[in-house]
Amino acid sequence: MLQKPNSAYFHIPFCSHICYYCDFAKVLMTGQPIDAYIESLIEEFQSFEIEKLRTIYIGGGTPSVLSAQQLERLLTAIAEQLDLEVLEEFTVEANPGDLSDEVIKVLADSAVNRISLGVQTFNNALLKKIGRTHTEVQVYDSVERLKKAGFENITIDLIYALPGQTMEMVKSDVEKFLELKLPHVALYSLILEDHTVFMNRQRRGLLRLPSEDKNADMYEYIMDILAKNGYNHYEVSNFGLPGFESKHNITYWDNEEYYGIGAGASGYLAGIRYKNLGPVHHYLKAAPTEKRINEEVLSKKSQIEEEMFLGLRKKSGVLVEKFENKFKCSFEKLYGEQITELINQKLLYNDRQRIHMTDKGFELGNNVFEKFLLDDINF
């Protein structure tokens, strides 16, 4: 009997507004059948007959745009089906401008024990420029009220290399994060994605972004200052105080299987990567067990490549023994030449049969990852 995954992702696709950089599965909430969606989400969850989970993540979209009643309905239905004794981490994403006292109370009274706030920047002018509707003051207010409600495991997302952003602005954002004394932060370099406002502006020559060198300088500063303040740089974009690393996201980077539940959600079950129907109305019409629009049975080649791409994102890297036990092949035969080349370029370490990236490797991640693409003749 196949072992069931220990993690589940739930997708809430609704947003009160669309940010200029976002390409996630989302839809403006006005006029949407949100109550019906919550019920359909619950039905899909129940169809898996899950009894135990170690981590849960509710993301979006914007989960915090749900009313207190809608959120309570979802959280209660999830909790009723699970053995909460084995649930270690339950994260819900929120926007600083959406967190009402009623929503915070529902979160505090539930099994949720981690909140992820989409801050992006503390600079009000930049917030407006990237299409965010909250303000710096609302960030402080949300954090204060979450702490008062008993949440200590709070993480925020920040984006750097934004249009018109200077090094001084990045330093200010990191300093303000440190002043909040939160245990975790995810810092992402802006990536332009298709079908976004920013990509459309870029194609018309209307977007002024920091240079690649400036982007690298920003990342180096971030790594340095957070390390000096005790944060473990445990993944390319993630920094946590000891014990506050994201258990759920480590599931992804460890290339473990997980349930993906909701419109547009992706999952990984029994060696199959799948994606659910994206448009909300299409998702609602499908039966609970028939919501997938795409399935990909991963070849051994694809599984090995993903193991390297995902594993090397972690500071802890890839254990050679674990790799060989999982794939029943010689790591040295597959990747010996590439490892030697990357070590000589000071992009990788080989530390007692644990392959992991240097700080320089983190900066040039894609250059490292592409070295682990395999020719078909290897299998």
UniProtKB/Swiss-Prot annotation:
[4Fe-4S] cluster binds at residues 15, 19, 22. Gene3D superfamilies: Aldolase class I. The gene is hemW. S-adenosyl-L-methionine 1 binds at residues 9, 60, 93. One of its GO terms (cellular component) is cytoplasm. The keyword Heme applies. One of its GO terms (biological process) is porphyrin-containing compound biosynthetic process. Belongs to the anaerobic coproporphyrinogen-III oxidase family. HemW subfamily. PROSITE patterns: RADICAL_SAM. Keywords: 4Fe-4S, Cell membrane, Chaperone, Cytoplasm, Heme, Iron, Iron-sulfur, Membrane, Metal-binding, S-adenosyl-L-methionine. It comes from the Bacteria. GO terms for molecular function: 4 iron, 4 sulfur cluster binding; coproporphyrinogen oxidase activity; metal ion binding. This is Heme chaperone HemW. InterPro entries: Aldolase_TIM, Coproporphyrinogen-III_oxidase, Elp3/MiaA/NifB-like_rSAM, HemN_C, HemW-like, rSAM.
